[in-house]
C-alpha cells in the first residue's frame, strides 16, 4: 500500500493517484477526481459555490485574458473584490506564487507572479479573522464515519501563511 505523501503538482493533483490506479497499486488518501478538483482552486471554489458552502468571494482568469486584456481583467477583479485581494496560481500548493495585493499596482504585479506557476489565476477576497486547520479522515468501508483531528491555529509570521512560514520558520 502506497502513502502518497506529496505536495504540489503531480503529487496531490491526482496525477500520482491515477498512475497508482493504472498500475493497480492500492494507496491511501483521496482518489483521482477529488485530488484533481481540490488542487485546482478555481474548480474547488466552483464546487463550493454549487453546493452553497460558505467561503470567500472569488473570481479567476486564464493566461490568455491576463496577457491580452490586462486592463479589463484588473477592472473586473476590482469591481468584484475589495482590497486587499489574494492572488494565487490555481494549481500550486504550499502558498507558492501567492501574493496579497493592496492596490492596483500590486494586483498587476501579483498576476505575473501567479502566472509563473500556472496558466490560471484565482483572486480571492481577504477575510480578517482567526485561521485554523483541521483534517477530516473518512472510512471507505463506512462512508458515514468521519473522524477529525484536533484543530490547530495558524499563526502567520507575515501578512499571510507563506511558504517560509510553513517550511522554514
At which residue positions do the language-model features occur?
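Fold-independent oxyanion-binding glycine-rich loops
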Residues: 6-8, 58, 89-90, 126
Amino acid at each position: 500500500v502506497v502513502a502518497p505523501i506529496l505536495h504540489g503538482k503531480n503529487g496531490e493533483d491526482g496525477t500520482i493517484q491515477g498512475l497508482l490506479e493504472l498500475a493497480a497499486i492500492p494507496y491511501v488518501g483521496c482518489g483521482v477526481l477529488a485530488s484533481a478538483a481540490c488542487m485546482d482552486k478555481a474548480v474547488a471554489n466552483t464546487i463550493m459555490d454549487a453546493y452553497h458552502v460558505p467561503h470567500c468571494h472569488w473570481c479567476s482568469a486564464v493566461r490568455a485574458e491576463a496577457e491580452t486584456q490586462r486592463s479589463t481583467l484588473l477592472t473586473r477583479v476590482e469591481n468584484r473584490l475589495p482590497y486587499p485581494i489574494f492572488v494565487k496560481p490555481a494549481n500550486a500548493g504550499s502558498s507558492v506564487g501567492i501574493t496579497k495585493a493592496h492596490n492596483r499596482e500590486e494586483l498587476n504585479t501579483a498576476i505575473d507572479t501567479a502566472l509563473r506557476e500556472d496558466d490560471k489565476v484565482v483572486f480571492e477576497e481577504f477575510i480578517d479573522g482567526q485561521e485554523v486547520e483541521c483534517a477530516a479522515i473518512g472510512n471507505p468501508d463506512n462512508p458515514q464515519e468521519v473522524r477529525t483531528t484536533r484543530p490547530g491555529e495558524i499563526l502567520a509570521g507575515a501578512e499571510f501563511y507563506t511558504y517560509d512560514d510553513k517550511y522554514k520558520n
